[in-house]
UniProtKB/Swiss-Prot annotation:
Source superkingdom: Bacteria
Protein encoded by which gene: smg
InterPro entries: Smg
Protein name: Protein Smg homolog
Pfam families: DUF494
Source lineage: Bacteria, Pseudomonadati, Pseudomonadota, Gammaproteobacteria, Alteromonadales
Protein family membership: Belongs to the Smg family.
Length: 157
């Protein structure tokens, strides 16, 4: 599923090319690109759920963000994300690329990938996908792209 998400992000979402494409046409394109239909449907569902997160009033982690809160990772999350990944999540929050709300959106989408382990590179892409889905997060997206492509730039200033 992650490969389908990456393909969609790189070819449609990131450059706004897929904003008006019909779902059947998109599915056909992905099938022609060699993706499995079940994985395509999982990826499209993943993206739909991501879009729903920003409009959800039923998820308590989307209601408020307080700088006094501290994130404790569950045992399952610690197995899924190694120390390097957990430190990266704290780092991007500390430098203002994400906040508590977007961090929890990232955690939700990571869990939905249904992978037992998520590496740092995949984590970075999921963070970018989440940020890209949030209106007004253009600066955060640019900063995250710099982190993905190892161009620190002005992040630490």
């Amino acid at each position: 599923m992650f490969e389908v998400l990456m393909y969609l992000f790189e070819n449609y979402i990131h450059n706004d090319a897929g904003l008006f494409i019909e779902p059947n046409e998109l599915t056909d394109e992905l099938l022609r690109a060699g993706f499995n239909q079940a994985e395509i449907f999982k990826a499209l569902d993943w993206l739909e759920q991501l879009a729903e997160l920003q409009h959800s009033d039923t998820s308590p982690y989307l209601i408020t963000d307080s700088p006094q809160t501290m994130r404790i990772f569950t045992d399952h999350e610690c197995k899924m994300l190694d120390v390097q990944c957990r430190n990266f999540l704290m780092f991007v929050e500390r430098i203002g690329v994400t906040n508590g709300i977007t961090r929890e959106m990232v955690m939700d989408r990571l869990a939905a990938l249904d992978k037992s382990f998520i590496g740092l590179d995949d984590l970075k892409w999921v963070v970018l996908m989440v940020l890209f889905n949030i209106p007004g997060a253009e600066v955060a997206c640019e900063q995250m792209e710099d982190l993905i492509f190892d161009q620190p730039g002005d992040l630490l200033h």
